[in-house]
Protein backbone atom coordinates (compact mmCIF):
# COMPACT_ATOMS: atom_id res chain seq x y z
CA UNK A 1 0.00 0.00 0.00
CA UNK A 2 2.88 2.36 0.73
CA UNK A 3 4.31 2.06 -2.77
CA UNK A 4 3.67 5.45 -4.40
CA UNK A 5 1.25 6.42 -1.58
CA UNK A 6 1.75 8.53 1.56
CA UNK A 7 1.54 6.98 5.04
CA UNK A 8 -1.32 9.23 6.22
CA UNK A 9 -3.41 8.10 3.24
CA UNK A 10 -2.61 4.42 3.77
CA UNK A 11 -3.31 4.10 7.51
CA UNK A 12 -7.15 3.80 7.42
CA UNK A 13 -6.97 1.45 4.42
CA UNK A 14 -4.35 -0.71 6.14
CA UNK A 15 -6.38 -0.91 9.35
CA UNK A 16 -9.57 -1.92 7.51
CA UNK A 17 -7.69 -4.39 5.31
CA UNK A 18 -5.91 -6.19 8.16
CA UNK A 19 -9.10 -6.26 10.20
CA UNK A 20 -10.91 -7.94 7.32
CA UNK A 21 -8.07 -10.30 6.38
CA UNK A 22 -6.33 -11.41 9.56
CA UNK A 23 -4.40 -14.26 7.94
CA UNK A 24 -2.79 -15.02 4.61
CA UNK A 25 -5.27 -17.86 4.17
CA UNK A 26 -8.31 -15.61 4.59
CA UNK A 27 -6.85 -13.19 2.03
CA UNK A 28 -6.21 -16.02 -0.43
CA UNK A 29 -9.92 -16.93 -0.36
CA UNK A 30 -10.96 -13.44 -1.46
CA UNK A 31 -11.55 -12.28 -5.04
CA UNK A 32 -10.79 -9.34 -7.32
CA UNK A 33 -14.09 -7.55 -6.69
CA UNK A 34 -13.79 -7.66 -2.90
CA UNK A 35 -10.12 -6.64 -2.85
CA UNK A 36 -10.59 -3.78 -5.31
CA UNK A 37 -13.61 -2.47 -3.40
CA UNK A 38 -11.51 -2.29 -0.22
CA UNK A 39 -8.67 -0.65 -2.18
CA UNK A 40 -11.02 1.90 -3.75
CA UNK A 41 -9.48 5.38 -3.62
CA UNK A 42 -5.87 4.24 -3.07
CA UNK A 43 -5.07 4.02 -6.77
CA UNK A 44 -2.40 1.86 -8.45
CA UNK A 45 -4.84 -1.05 -8.35
CA UNK A 46 -2.37 -3.53 -9.81
CA UNK A 47 -0.87 -3.66 -6.30
CA UNK A 48 -4.14 -5.06 -4.95
CA UNK A 49 -4.40 -7.70 -7.66
CA UNK A 50 -0.78 -8.72 -7.18
CA UNK A 51 -1.26 -8.96 -3.41
CA UNK A 52 -4.20 -11.30 -3.88
CA UNK A 53 -2.27 -13.48 -6.33
CA UNK A 54 0.73 -13.58 -3.98
CA UNK A 55 -1.49 -14.77 -1.13
CA UNK A 56 -2.96 -17.55 -3.26
CA UNK A 57 0.49 -18.74 -4.41
CA UNK A 58 1.99 -18.64 -0.90
CA UNK A 59 -0.90 -20.64 0.57
CA UNK A 60 -0.98 -23.19 -2.24
CA UNK A 61 2.74 -23.70 -2.94
CA UNK A 62 4.57 -22.58 0.21
CA UNK A 63 2.27 -23.63 3.07
CA UNK A 64 1.49 -19.98 3.89
CA UNK A 65 5.17 -19.22 4.46
CA UNK A 66 7.41 -16.69 2.74
CA UNK A 67 10.26 -18.48 0.89
CA UNK A 68 13.83 -17.79 2.01
CA UNK A 69 15.14 -17.93 -1.54
CA UNK A 70 15.29 -14.60 -3.38
CA UNK A 71 14.76 -16.51 -6.63
CA UNK A 72 11.48 -17.96 -5.34
CA UNK A 73 10.32 -14.66 -3.86
CA UNK A 74 10.91 -12.85 -7.17
CA UNK A 75 8.60 -15.35 -8.89
CA UNK A 76 5.69 -13.81 -6.96
CA UNK A 77 3.54 -11.31 -8.92
CA UNK A 78 4.75 -7.72 -8.64
CA UNK A 79 7.88 -8.59 -6.64
CA UNK A 80 11.17 -7.18 -7.94
CA UNK A 81 14.58 -6.62 -6.35
CA UNK A 82 13.45 -3.91 -3.95
CA UNK A 83 10.44 -5.80 -2.55
CA UNK A 84 12.34 -9.11 -2.44
CA UNK A 85 15.19 -7.60 -0.41
CA UNK A 86 12.74 -5.79 1.88
CA UNK A 87 10.86 -9.04 2.57
CA UNK A 88 14.00 -11.10 3.21
CA UNK A 89 15.35 -8.43 5.54
CA UNK A 90 12.14 -7.62 7.41
CA UNK A 91 10.61 -11.11 7.60
CA UNK A 92 13.66 -13.39 7.76
CA UNK A 93 16.15 -10.92 9.28
CA UNK A 94 18.61 -11.57 6.45
CA UNK A 95 21.46 -9.11 5.77
CA UNK A 96 19.70 -7.23 2.98
CA UNK A 97 19.04 -3.61 2.10
CA UNK A 98 15.88 -2.52 0.31
CA UNK A 99 17.08 0.16 -2.08
CA UNK A 100 14.22 2.61 -2.47
CA UNK A 101 14.40 6.31 -3.31
CA UNK A 102 15.06 7.27 0.32
CA UNK A 103 17.99 4.87 0.67
CA UNK A 104 19.46 5.94 -2.67
CA UNK A 105 19.32 9.58 -1.59
CA UNK A 106 20.94 8.78 1.77
CA UNK A 107 23.88 6.91 0.19
CA UNK A 108 24.17 9.41 -2.64
CA UNK A 109 24.42 12.37 -0.27
CA UNK A 110 26.82 10.59 2.05
CA UNK A 111 29.19 10.16 -0.90
CA UNK A 112 28.15 13.44 -2.58
CA UNK A 113 27.78 11.55 -5.85
CA UNK A 114 24.67 11.77 -8.04
CA UNK A 115 22.45 8.69 -7.93
CA UNK A 116 22.79 8.03 -11.66
CA UNK A 117 26.56 7.58 -11.18
CA UNK A 118 26.27 4.97 -8.41
CA UNK A 119 25.93 1.19 -8.79
CA UNK A 120 24.09 0.59 -5.52
CA UNK A 121 24.42 -3.21 -5.61
CA UNK A 122 28.21 -2.95 -5.93
CA UNK A 123 28.30 -0.27 -3.25
CA UNK A 124 26.46 -2.48 -0.76
CA UNK A 125 28.58 -5.52 -1.63
CA UNK A 126 31.77 -3.49 -1.14
CA UNK A 127 30.64 -2.19 2.27
CA UNK A 128 28.70 -5.19 3.56
CA UNK A 129 31.16 -5.89 6.40
CA UNK A 130 30.46 -2.47 7.91
CA UNK A 131 26.76 -2.38 6.98
CA UNK A 132 25.87 -5.76 8.44
CA UNK A 133 27.70 -5.68 11.76
CA UNK A 134 24.35 -5.78 13.51
CA UNK A 135 22.31 -8.93 14.09
CA UNK A 136 19.15 -6.82 13.84
CA UNK A 137 19.04 -6.76 10.05
CA UNK A 138 15.29 -6.20 9.95
CA UNK A 139 15.73 -3.01 11.98
CA UNK A 140 18.54 -1.89 9.66
CA UNK A 141 16.31 -2.29 6.57
CA UNK A 142 13.59 -0.16 8.12
CA UNK A 143 15.97 2.34 9.74
CA UNK A 144 17.66 3.23 6.44
CA UNK A 145 14.32 3.82 4.70
CA UNK A 146 12.94 5.85 7.62
CA UNK A 147 16.13 7.88 8.02
CA UNK A 148 16.05 8.82 4.35
CA UNK A 149 12.36 9.71 4.51
CA UNK A 150 12.37 11.68 7.78
CA UNK A 151 15.89 13.06 8.19
CA UNK A 152 17.72 13.04 4.85
CA UNK A 153 14.69 14.54 3.11
CA UNK A 154 14.61 15.43 -0.60
CA UNK A 155 14.23 19.13 0.22
CA UNK A 156 15.78 21.04 3.12
CA UNK A 157 17.52 18.14 4.94
CA UNK A 158 18.45 19.01 8.54
CA UNK A 159 22.17 18.31 8.10
CA UNK A 160 23.36 20.25 11.16
CA UNK A 161 21.66 17.90 13.64
CA UNK A 162 22.22 14.75 11.56
CA UNK A 163 24.13 11.98 13.33
CA UNK A 164 25.92 11.11 10.06
CA UNK A 165 27.29 14.57 9.29
CA UNK A 166 30.80 13.71 10.51
CA UNK A 167 31.29 11.34 7.58
CA UNK A 168 28.84 12.91 5.12
CA UNK A 169 30.61 14.41 2.10
CA UNK A 170 27.45 16.28 1.09
CA UNK A 171 27.45 18.13 4.41
CA UNK A 172 31.17 18.93 4.22
CA UNK A 173 31.29 19.91 0.56
CA UNK A 174 30.90 23.43 -0.81
CA UNK A 175 29.76 21.92 -4.11
CA UNK A 176 26.74 19.82 -3.25
CA UNK A 177 24.97 17.46 -5.65
CA UNK A 178 21.37 18.12 -6.66
CA UNK A 179 19.04 15.38 -5.38
CA UNK A 180 15.76 16.95 -6.49
CA UNK A 181 14.06 14.82 -9.12
CA UNK A 182 11.92 16.63 -11.64
CA UNK A 183 8.91 14.60 -12.69
CA UNK A 184 8.39 14.40 -16.43
CA UNK A 185 4.79 15.55 -16.90
CA UNK A 186 2.91 14.37 -19.97
CA UNK A 187 -0.20 16.15 -21.23
CA UNK A 188 -2.92 14.11 -22.94
CA UNK A 189 -6.32 15.01 -24.38
CA UNK A 190 -9.26 12.61 -24.21
CA UNK A 191 -12.96 12.51 -25.10
CA UNK A 192 -15.25 10.44 -22.87
CA UNK A 193 -18.67 9.34 -24.14
CA UNK A 194 -21.29 8.44 -21.52
CA UNK A 195 -24.48 6.53 -22.29
CA UNK A 196 -27.08 7.20 -19.59
CA UNK A 197 -30.46 5.45 -19.32
CA UNK A 198 -33.78 6.46 -17.71
CA UNK A 199 -32.84 4.73 -14.43
CA UNK A 200 -29.86 7.05 -13.98
CA UNK A 201 -27.42 4.32 -14.89
CA UNK A 202 -24.28 4.62 -17.00
CA UNK A 203 -22.88 2.05 -19.43
CA UNK A 204 -19.35 0.99 -18.42
CA UNK A 205 -16.96 -1.60 -19.81
CA UNK A 206 -13.65 -3.04 -18.65
CA UNK A 207 -11.02 -1.02 -20.48
CA UNK A 208 -8.15 -2.79 -22.21
CA UNK A 209 -7.10 -0.01 -24.58
CA UNK A 210 -5.97 2.92 -22.41
CA UNK A 211 -2.79 1.54 -20.78
CA UNK A 212 -2.77 3.70 -17.62
CA UNK A 213 -6.42 2.79 -16.90
CA UNK A 214 -6.18 -0.89 -17.83
CA UNK A 215 -8.94 -3.13 -16.39
CA UNK A 216 -10.85 -0.12 -15.03
CA UNK A 217 -14.60 0.10 -15.59
CA UNK A 218 -14.97 3.09 -17.91
CA UNK A 219 -17.33 4.68 -20.41
CA UNK A 220 -16.14 4.84 -24.00
CA UNK A 221 -12.87 6.82 -24.02
CA UNK A 222 -10.76 7.97 -26.97
CA UNK A 223 -7.97 10.42 -27.68
CA UNK A 224 -9.48 13.75 -28.67
CA UNK A 225 -10.61 14.00 -32.29
CA UNK A 226 -13.24 16.74 -32.71
CA UNK A 227 -13.95 15.87 -36.35
CA UNK A 228 -14.95 12.28 -35.47
CA UNK A 229 -17.60 13.14 -32.85
CA UNK A 230 -21.14 12.12 -33.79
CA UNK A 231 -23.76 14.90 -33.54
CA UNK A 232 -25.89 12.73 -31.22
CA UNK A 233 -23.38 13.28 -28.44
CA UNK A 234 -23.95 16.39 -26.30
CA UNK A 235 -21.01 18.20 -24.76
CA UNK A 236 -21.29 18.40 -20.95
CA UNK A 237 -18.05 19.74 -19.50
CA UNK A 238 -14.30 20.06 -19.90
CA UNK A 239 -12.20 19.22 -16.85
CA UNK A 240 -8.68 18.28 -15.78
CA UNK A 241 -7.49 15.12 -14.07
CA UNK A 242 -4.05 13.95 -12.96
CA UNK A 243 -2.86 10.34 -12.77
CA UNK A 244 0.74 9.82 -11.70
CA UNK A 245 2.84 11.85 -14.16
CA UNK A 246 -0.04 12.39 -16.59
CA UNK A 247 -2.12 15.55 -16.87
CA UNK A 248 -5.37 14.79 -18.64
CA UNK A 249 -7.52 17.34 -20.42
CA UNK A 250 -10.95 15.70 -20.71
CA UNK A 251 -14.04 16.58 -22.75
CA UNK A 252 -17.10 14.83 -21.37
CA UNK A 253 -19.99 14.00 -23.72
CA UNK A 254 -23.27 12.23 -23.02
CA UNK A 255 -26.45 10.96 -24.60
CA UNK A 256 -29.58 9.30 -23.23
CA UNK A 257 -29.97 5.74 -24.42
CA UNK A 258 -31.47 2.54 -23.04
CA UNK A 259 -29.50 0.44 -25.50
CA UNK A 260 -26.54 -1.34 -23.92
CA UNK A 261 -23.57 -1.90 -26.27
CA UNK A 262 -21.82 -5.31 -26.33
CA UNK A 263 -19.44 -5.97 -23.39
CA UNK A 264 -20.93 -3.06 -21.39
CA UNK A 265 -22.88 -3.21 -18.11
CA UNK A 266 -25.15 -0.69 -16.39
CA UNK A 267 -23.86 1.00 -13.22
CA UNK A 268 -25.75 3.38 -10.96
CA UNK A 269 -24.68 7.02 -11.10
CA UNK A 270 -25.29 7.36 -7.36
CA UNK A 271 -24.18 4.23 -5.53
CA UNK A 272 -22.29 1.10 -6.49
CA UNK A 273 -21.61 -1.96 -4.37
CA UNK A 274 -19.02 -3.05 -6.91
CA UNK A 275 -15.60 -1.45 -7.26
CA UNK A 276 -15.56 1.77 -9.25
CA UNK A 277 -12.18 3.57 -9.50
CA UNK A 278 -11.83 7.23 -8.47
CA UNK A 279 -11.31 8.23 -12.09
CA UNK A 280 -14.75 6.87 -13.01
CA UNK A 281 -16.40 8.21 -9.84
CA UNK A 282 -15.48 11.75 -10.89
CA UNK A 283 -17.32 11.14 -14.16
CA UNK A 284 -20.40 9.81 -12.34
CA UNK A 285 -20.56 12.89 -10.11
CA UNK A 286 -20.54 15.18 -13.13
CA UNK A 287 -23.41 13.22 -14.71
CA UNK A 288 -25.73 13.16 -11.67
CA UNK A 289 -26.95 16.68 -12.47
CA UNK A 290 -28.42 15.60 -15.83
List each model region and its residues.
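Intrinsically disordered, low-complexity, charged terminal extensions of DNA damage-control enzymes
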Residues: 146-290
